[in-house]
Design a protein with these regions (language model features):
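C-terminal low-complexity, charged extensions that often adopt amphipathic alpha-helices
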Residues: 1-2, 10, 101-147
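Surface-exposed, low-hydrophobicity interaction/linker segments
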Residues: 1, 13-57
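A common structural junction motif
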Residues: 83-92
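Helix N-cap motif at beta-to-alpha junctions
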Residues: 68-75
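Short active-site loop/helix that positions an aromatic residue
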Residues: 78-81
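The conserved glycine-aromatic submotif of the RRM
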Residues: 59-66
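Beta-strand cores of modular interaction/reader domains in eukaryotic scaffold and signaling proteins
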Residues: 10-12, 66-68, 95-97
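Conserved beta-strand -> loop -> alpha-helix junction used to position metal-binding or nucleic-acid-contacting
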Residues: 91-105
Length: 147
C-alpha cells in the first residue's frame, strides 16, 4: 500500500474588526467556507482533488486551525484561502503561518507559536474567565482539539 502524502497548513483566522479572542465558530463553518472557496476558484476539479484528504482541526488557541490536504492540492488550497473574506457569520480571512509535510513538525511550530503569542493574548483579556483560560493554555502549551 502506498502512503498518501499530505501537506499541513497552520493558519490563523484574523477577524476584520480586530478582535483576537474566541468566537463561536464551528469547525463545520470553516470546512464549508474552505470547500466553497475551492469550488469558486478551482471548480469541481479543485474540490475533488482536495476533498480526498481535506481535514480541518481547530485548536484551543482561539484563531488557529490546521488544515490537512493532499500534496497535489495544497497550492490550490492556498490560492483559495486568499479569497476567503467571510467565515460563518464573521468577516475574517486566513493568514497562513506554516506549511509542513508532517503533522509533527506542524505541531512543533504551533507549540513555539503559542509560547510567543499567548502572553500577548493574556494582556488583552477583559474578564477573569478569559484570563483563566489563557493561563491554562500557557501552562499546558499543548494543542487541544475543539469539538
Amino acid at each position: 500500500m502506498v502512503r498518501q502524502k499530505n501537506r499541513y497548513l497552520l493558519c490563523e483566522i484574523i477577524y476584520i474588526d480586530g478582535r483576537r479572542l474566541h468566537r463561536n465558530l464551528q469547525q463545520r463553518d470553516i470546512y464549508h467556507c474552505v470547500r466553497n472557496a475551492l469550488a469558486k476558484e478551482h471548480g469541481e476539479y479543485g474540490v475533488a482533488l482536495a476533498l480526498r484528504s481535506l481535514s480541518i482541526q481547530a485548536y484551543f488557541h482561539p484563531n488557529i486551525v490546521m488544515i490537512r490536504v493532499s500534496r497535489d492540492a495544497h497550492k490550490m488550497l492556498q490560492s483559495a484561502l486568499f479569497f476567503i473574506r467571510k467565515i460563518g457569520q464573521y468577516e475574517a480571512f486566513f493568514n497562513t503561518l506554516h506549511i509542513s509535510g508532517t503533522i509533527r513538525t506542524c505541531q512543533k511550530f504551533y507549540v513555539g507559536y503559542l509560547r510567543r503569542e499567548l502572553p500577548k493574548l493574556l494582556r488583552e483579556c477583559k474578564t477573569p474567565e478569559e484570563e483563566k483560560e489563557v493561563k491554562k493554555a500557557i501552562s499546558s502549551c499543548v494543542p487541544v482539539e475543539v469539538t
